[in-house]
Amino acid sequence: MSQNLNPVQPKVLLDGENISFESLVLEQSMNSCHRFEVVCEFMSQDEMWKQTPQKLLNRIGSRAVITFEHKDSGTPYEFSGWVTDVRIDAWESEPDYEFLNHRSNRVHIIGEGDVVKLNGSRGMDSFVDCQLKTIVSQATQPAGITVECDPAFNGVIPYVMRYQESVFEFLNRLSSTYNELFFYDGKTLIFGQPKKSPEVALTFDHDVFSLCTRASALPSSVAAYEYIHESDKQLCVEGAKDSGTGLLSNVKGCADRLYDDQELVHSSSSVTSDSDLKTLLDKKSKTLGGSMLSIEGQTRTCQVVLGGIVEVIFPSKMGVPSLGRYRVVEVVHKVDKSGNYSNHFVGTPANNEFITQRYSGSVKAYPEMAMVSSNSDPKSLGRVQVQFDWQKRAGKSTNWIRVQTPDAGGSGMTNRGMVFIPEEGDQVMVGFEYGDPNRPYVMGSVFSGSEGKGGGDGNNKRTILTKSGHQIVFDDDKGGSWGITIADSNGNTINLSSSQKTIVISSQENIVLQSKNITLEAEEKISQKSGKDFDVTVGNDYKLEVEKNSSSLVKGDSVESIEGDYSNNTQGKIDISVGDDYKCDISGKMKLSVNSDASFEFSGKLDSESSGDSTLNSKGKMYVKGSGDVYIGK
């Protein structure tokens, strides 16, 4: 085993004060806030307690700066963080032999990296139509830490929600969703590809005194589906098959032969195009491939840093090729006051574009209340924007989200179903597709205490009511107003009375029936009544058939004007009774034909006058009689 010929000179500063310590451990891994523990040893309890508990405990919240540097060579590594815990340890050990009892007199100063400021209270936040770079910038800005953000995924994300999690947990989940690197390098928070990665070559049995390689066969063929409602487009995309290089290509080839099926799940993120979905799947495929191979080792060089690249080589005398280049995803540094240093690291293939995720958390969103902030969908797709209670303080809302309805679909070029869009200010229940907080939709509306109306006594009424007062009421009260009523806010109604078996149509002004053909048919009686005028206009023929008697009563004058011929055919008698004068003016000829006898009787005087000649012809006898004299004059 190699000798530690180049010890490390460690330094710990707490609020600028150089601290003497017994030992130091710094644990670092991707997707974590890191953890350090500094142990200060005291010769006696008196010496330790003279520091006073108050002074020792006041170390909490101190700014910590830890530096590793080889005494003879190498670039120093610096880590900054905050003290979060202090433990004063005056504890008697329990050895196997009583005479070897030992009491420790130690103070443990424990802390995390700068990014712990992002890992505070859980909360909610939202981002609309943003890229990852914008989301990371806005989420981390209040903490005032240094951030380097260069994600490979540059698509615009319609809606992203931080859901009951700290900012750090939210960014962790975001990095997992989009398969982006996410780690703290000791000074800077990295999201995406780092601008530069420190590289170091490690020689086995010189720099590396323990080494382990691990290969695992995993399925890496992926596909996903997604529905884009704005364009009514269903996507199903496959990820690229990355064969990898070096040792990884061998492992992946074996895995592909073992697992010949393909994963098919919904997209991990809502996307707006098939190219964005393709980018996500390509990255996921590479990430899965990279997780098949890893190395683990122990070294005595502090140049092995998180996110850096290590290449493991073998002495030339062994004739073994290099194991390749690996990105450090975990490293634990240990050092004592004398500079005796070692670390334990884990690496995954650096030539793989994306690394194995070290995030194992998950979030499932549950339905919650919101208020409709707008229903003026710019694309007229029947969507709304809603505002959750937690969004009100920041004045935020969701993006345009769809509204669930009992029936919805399409018929040709138009939509079909129940088109009921909530109004601004309405309370709605919001659900999330797949439990994903980034995919909200309106499940339905709810009444508030000041707005709710029940179904009346016996819960017999079902009502559809619009904001202007139009309503349809279904009444199931068979002992009351059983039926259906359609009414507008002006009092126009259509009432279908189930109890009276009657339909009543009522209007404040006009009722207009307009159609190509209209038929009114009654088994018994049709009644028409007008309070004033009654007009009938017929554009063509007018026909009236009465199987029995017909009567017409006009209490005022009656005028009948016929521009064409007039014909009156009666199978029986015609009685004309006139209470006053009767006058018949004929502009043309008049012919009166009687198939039987005809008689004219007048109680008064009869005058017959002709402007032209008059002829009375009879095929039989003609009698002119008078009760008195009869005069025929010239």
Where are these regions (language model features)?
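Surface-exposed cap/loop segments at beta↔alpha junctions
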Residues: 50-147, 159-160
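Short beta-strand-centered interaction patches in the first periplasmic/extracellular domains
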Residues: 106, 113-115, 151-218, 439-443
